[in-house]
């Protein structure tokens, strides 16, 4: 699933080795050349209908006060920033934090989707393919609480 504010694209990752995260990123780097030619910023890796991560970052999805990120498995790189956020959210009383499966269909009902990595910090996702998140006209004006929180954590811990 391509992530971009203007272009609608979808990519399939059929040859990613499930047991080697480094191979995932080699494939992601190869695919990123195709993305840049199509003005797509990133791509979500989906395996058997479940969201794993993006090509460049870990993913966090918020539904009201519940924040979910995919469980770390052998095919997901353990992100430094992901770990900082997970530890913070586990101690934070304002959110219920879960490491759980996220289906592609779950993304359509999200209140907020944020990609994070230790180099770029947090990126708020506004559109995946032709779906705007969430399906509310005032989303851009809405208080993007996770996005702001994650960037604050990034600035305090990694910048």
What are the language-model segments listed below?
Residues 1-159:
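Helix-start/capping segments and mature chain N-termini
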């Amino acid at each position: 699933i391509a992530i971009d504010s203007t272009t609608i694209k979808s990519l399939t990752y059929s040859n990613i080795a499930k047991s080697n995260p480094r191979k995932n990123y080699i494939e992601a780097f190869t695919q990123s050349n195709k993305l840049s030619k199509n003005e797509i910023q990133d791509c979500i890796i989906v395996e058997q209908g479940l969201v794993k991560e993006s090509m460049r970052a870990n993913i966090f999805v918020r539904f009201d006060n519940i924040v979910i990120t995919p469980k770390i498995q052998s095919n997901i790189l353990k992100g430094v920033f992901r770990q900082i956020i997970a530890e913070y959210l586990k101690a934070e009383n304002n959110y219920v934090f879960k490491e759980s499966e996220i289906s592609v269909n779950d993304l359509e009902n999200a209140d907020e989707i944020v990609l994070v990595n230790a180099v770029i910090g947090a990126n708020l996702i506004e559109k995946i393919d032709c779906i705007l998140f969430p399906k509310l006209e005032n989303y851009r004006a809405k208080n993007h609480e996770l996005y702001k929180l994650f960037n604050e954590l990034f600035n305090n811990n990694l910048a």
